[in-house]
Amino acid sequence: MEALSTAIGSNLCWVQPKTLERQFELRTEGGLFGSLRFEKALGTLATASSAAGRWTFKRAGFMNPRVTIREAGRDVDLAVYWPKFWGGGWLECADGSRFQWKSMNFWGTSWGFANTREELVFTMKPGAEKSKLSDLLKSQAIVEIGTQSFGLAELPLLLMLGWYLMIMQQDDAATTAAVIS
């Protein structure tokens, strides 16, 4: 995998190579910058990889929901994401840094992380630069990273976690639709 710093000026997209597999790649036309793979078809445990490291994400708690973020192979939380009831939430890192996950539009189709000064780190919106008919049932997103964010040490982790949160949101919406119908 390539370092994100080499992607400055490129169009980054999250793509799903195979429709029925819960595996995703962060790509430009010519390079691979990250991956996210769910361990089970219906579970919430996922492993994310980039040139900066490997992490696991796991949703936990019912009355007090959260997503734990750990370095792969470790049992200590590196960070915890605390969702808010109506969407969005806060990521609290072990070093004290915090980032807000929030909707970028009224419909909640575009999401991104911002720092505590409310400066956007990046945004993700569903779709692909070049959509094909075979992509119709795949989860994909266009990623727009602020140029000031490429030097941010947490950027690779935030990109992986952001996509994990979008996939979890899609799964929750599909489950709700199935229950209601």
Mark where each language-model region is.
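Intrinsically disordered, low-complexity proline/glycine-rich segments
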Residues: 1-181
